[in-house]
């Protein structure tokens, strides 16, 4: 019997309770994650942009959404006519303003044939303007190529 008591005590002392961390309290963890997402940004019910990404992380307290897998954004005018498309490696959307910053190999192509290349590009949803302070390259259908630093335009690149 003493051997069983000793073995029982050894068994109990070897069992420990694993501590479970509350993941929601960890800084930097998203509140929600989704894959293969489509986000529609509207202004008073009118579609202004349709955002697609392979992966989304939503941070409620910080009020932003991180898109980090092949982002594609289709822009629309006030009559919901397609005007341009933007692609990037990743993007952040400010949920309070619906502003978006695209980052990494950003390419914006207007339906009129103008193409903009940059490392980052911000879309101000209220003003419906694209802008950057980065180096840019613009190509046109007439085979013109322009280089510069900084850029601002309507989302249709006119």
Tell me what each language-model feature is:
Residues 15-158:
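N-terminal amphipathic/hydrophobic interface segments
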């Amino acid at each position: 019997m003493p051997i069983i008591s000793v073995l029982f005590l050894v068994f109990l002392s070897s069992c420990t309770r694993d501590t479970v961390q509350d993941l929601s309290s960890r800084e930097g963890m998203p509140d929600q994650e989704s894959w293969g997402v489509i986000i529609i940004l509207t202004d008073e019910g009118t579609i202004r942009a349709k955002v697609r990404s392979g992966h989304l992380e939503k941070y409620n307290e910080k009020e932003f959404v991180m898109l980090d897998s092949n982002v594609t954004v289709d822009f629309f005018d006030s009559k919901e006519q397609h005007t341009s498309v933007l692609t990037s490696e990743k993007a952040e959307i400010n949920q309070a303003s619906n502003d978006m910053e695209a980052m990494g190999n950003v390419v914006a192509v207007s339906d009129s044939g103008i193409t903009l290349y940059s490392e980052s590009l911000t879309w101000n949803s209220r003003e419906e303007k694209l802008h950057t302070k980065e180096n840019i390259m613009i190509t046109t259908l007439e085979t013109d190529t322009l280089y510069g630093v900084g850029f601002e335009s309507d989302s249709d690149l006119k």
